[in-house]
Amino acid sequence: MELTPAQEDGHVVYRGIFTAPDDVELVWYHFRLSWADGGTSCYGKNGLCAWDAVEPWQLTVYDDTHKTPAWFGRGVTYQIFPDRFRRAKSRDVAGLVGPRTLHDNWDELPEYRPNSEGEITCSDFFGGDLQGITEKLDYLASLGVTTLYLCPIFEASTNHRYDTACYERIDPLLGDEADFRMLCAEAKKRGIYVMLDGVFNHTGRKSVYFNADGFYDDLGAAQGEQSPYYRWYNFHPFPDEYDAWWGIKNLPAVNELEKSYVDYIIEGDNSIIKHWLRAGASGWRLDVADELPDEFIAKIRAAMNEENPDTYLLGEVWEDGTTKIAYSQRRKYLLGRETNGLMNYPFRTALMAYLLGGGAEYFRDSMEELRENYPAPAFYGAMNFLSTHDTPRLLTILGLTSPAPQTRDERAVYQLSDSDLARGMSLLKLAALILYTFPGSPMLY
C-alpha cells in the first residue's frame, strides 16, 4: 500500500487507502518504516520496535447487511432466574419430571451440598413463576428495564433448567404457554422485550429426547435406534456411554448439525426458534455458544431474520468474540452472519481486576482493544454485567479480605463479615457507576 505525505500543522502526515477483503475475516496490520541510514523499524500496538517484536492492530471485516435491532443496548437488561424471582401461585410437583422438592418458605436456604452419592441434584424448588414476573413488570419498568433475559423456562428436572426435558412446553411449575404469551404482551406494553435462553448444545438426560429413566411414554434415544431422536446423540457404546457437556452425564450432548435436529430447533415450519418468537419472545441468548458450530448459529440467525428482522441473537462467549478459537477453529460470532452481540465477560474480568487493586490502565486498554476489535453494532450492543448465574456474586469477591471458602460445606454457610460487607458495598457502588455509564446494555442480576 502506498502512503502519500502531506503537511499538517507543521507535521508530515502519511495517508493511504486500504481495500478490505471481499468476504468477512480478520486482518492484521502494522507499519514498516525505512530510515535514511538503511535501517528498518516497525510500528504497531506496542509502539516502535523491531520487526520480530511488533504487535499488529486488528481490523474486523464484517457483513453489515442485517442491522442490529435498535431496542437492545439502549436500556437496562434484567436477568431473571425464574424459580427465585416471584411466586404468584402455589403449585404441586407431583407427576413432574424430577424428583423435585418444593420449599414452602421462600426464605429458606437452597440445598448446596451433594447428596449421599456425591451428586449435586439441583432438585429443590421455590416455585417462582411467569405470573409472578408479570405482576412485577411495573416495578421493572420503573428501573429503566427494557429487556428481560429469562434463564431457561422450558420443562426440565432441575431448578436451573439447563437440562431441557421438552423445548415445546413451559415447565409446569412456571405456568404454561398462555402465561408466557401474557408476560410478553404485558411487557411489550411497557416497552420491555423478552429474551429467552436457548440451550441447544445438550438436552437433559431426563428428557423426551433422551429419556434415560423412561419417565416419558415416547421412545427416547436411550431406548435404542427405533427412537426418532437416536441420531441426535453419540453413543460409545450404547446405552451407558455417550458424549455429554463437559462429561456431565445429566447433560447428553447433541449432534447440532443432524438434519432432524436442525429442522426441529431451527428450520421447520414450527421450529422451536420460530414458535417462541411467534409466542412473543423478541430474542434468544445462546447458551455455551462456543460449543455450537458456526453453521448452526448462522442458521438460527437466518431463521430469526426471516421470522422477524427486529429480533436479537446474543451469544454466551467468555472471551473477545472476534479472536475466540474453539476446537481449533477461529469463530465467526461477530462477522455479521451469526450473533448480534455477546455477553461481555471481558468487561467483567477487566473491571474486577481493577477493583481488586490492579491499575486503571489495564481496564482502559482492555476495553479500548475490545472497542477496536468489535464491529460498532456489537460493541454498543453488548450485554455488560457484574455477576450472572455462572459467576460468584461480585459483592462477595470484592468484600473478601481472607481466603475464599473452598469446600461445598464451607460455601453453603459462608457469609461476609460486617466489615467485609461494608468494603464490598463501597467497591460495588464504584462498579455500578462504571457499568451504567459504559457503552452497551447494563445487565442487572
Where are these regions (language model features)?
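Short alpha-helical segments and helix-capping/turn motifs at coil-helix boundaries
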Residues: 15, 61-66, 133-136, 298-300, ...
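Short amphipathic alpha-helices and their capping/turn segments at secondary-structure boundaries
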Residues: 66-70, 134-144, 184, 370-375, ...
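Substrate-binding/active-site clefts of carbohydrate-active enzymes
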Residues: 81-146, 153-279, 300-307, 323-324
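Active-site-proximal helices and loops of the catalytic beta/alpha 8
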Residues: 181-193, 201-202, 207-218, 272-274, ...
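Short, flexible loop/turn elements at secondary-structure junctions
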Residues: 5, 18-22, 35, 81-84, ...
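The feature marks proteins involved in alpha-glucan
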Residues: 2-81, 85-115, 125
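Hydrophobic faces of well-ordered beta-strands that scaffold small-molecule active sites
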Residues: 76-78, 148-150, 194-196, 284, ...
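Active-site-proximal substrate-binding groove within the catalytic cores of carbohydrate-active enzymes
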Residues: 358-445
